[in-house]
From Swiss-Prot:
PROSITE patterns: ISPF. Involved in the biosynthesis of isopentenyl diphosphate (IPP) and dimethylallyl diphosphate (DMAPP), two major building blocks of isoprenoid compounds. Catalyzes the conversion of 4-diphosphocytidyl-2-C-methyl-D-erythritol 2-phosphate (CDP-ME2P) to 2-C-methyl-D-erythritol 2,4-cyclodiphosphate (ME-CPP) with a corresponding release of cytidine 5-monophosphate (CMP). One of its GO terms (molecular function) is metal ion binding. It comes from the Bacteria. GO terms for biological process: isopentenyl diphosphate biosynthetic process, methylerythritol 4-phosphate pathway; terpenoid biosynthetic process. This is 2-C-methyl-D-erythritol 2,4-cyclodiphosphate synthase. The record marks 34, 130 as: Transition state stabilizer. Homotrimer. It comes from Nocardia farcinica (strain IFM 10152). Its EC number is 4.6.1.12. Keywords: Isoprene biosynthesis, Lyase, Metal-binding. Its cofactor is a divalent metal cation.
Length: 155
């Protein structure tokens, strides 16, 4: 078994679509970034790559890779799952926590867990929290996410 941890943070960009945990949150401002700004999906990618010893999200999808510009977090997770398979791993489970005032994760938690779980073919737990007004997430300047992933060798 292999364990990985990942994180991501992006500034909020008014008027940009808000993609989070593979879902579009209508009426919410999204995050700026090289791709869709889905910090939950990006943190999961980071955790999965870390667990497999395959680097990090910046190395695989960073700004030096123009073919990944404006791509969805779902597409990134699909690519990471492919890379894991090539490296001989499969996902056992994963968890991601979104840190920010908005969007509210709770009302769409089950949907997010289903979408991410389907992408990884494994259970994914999704949660949300705030920082009680502290830091860039508390001031509404950005959104962060942390994730863990458990992998096993494919048999």
């Amino acid at each position: 078994m292999r364990v990985g941890i990942g994180s991501d943070v992006h500034p909020i960009e008014p008027g940009r679509p808000c993609w989070m945990a593979g879902l579009l949150f209508e009426g919410e401002d999204g995050c700026s970034g090289h791709s869709d700004g889905d910090v939950a999906a990006h943190a999961l990618c980071d955790a999965l790559l870390s667990a497999a010893g395959l680097g990090d999200v910046g190395a695989v999808f960073g700004t030096g890779r123009p073919e990944w510009a404006d791509v969805s977090g779902a597409a990134m997770l699909t690519e990471v799952r492919r890379l894991l398979g090539e490296a001989g791993f499969e996902v056992v489970n994963a968890a991601v926590q979104v840190i920010g005032n908005r969007p509210k994760i709770g009302p769409r938690r089950a949907e997010a867990q289903r979408v991410l779980g389907d992408l990884l073919d494994a259970p994914v737990s999704v949660s949300g929290t705030t920082t009680d007004g502290l830091g860039l997430t508390g001031r509404g300047e950005g959104i962060a996410a942390v994730a863990t992933a458990l992998l096993r060798p494919r048999v």
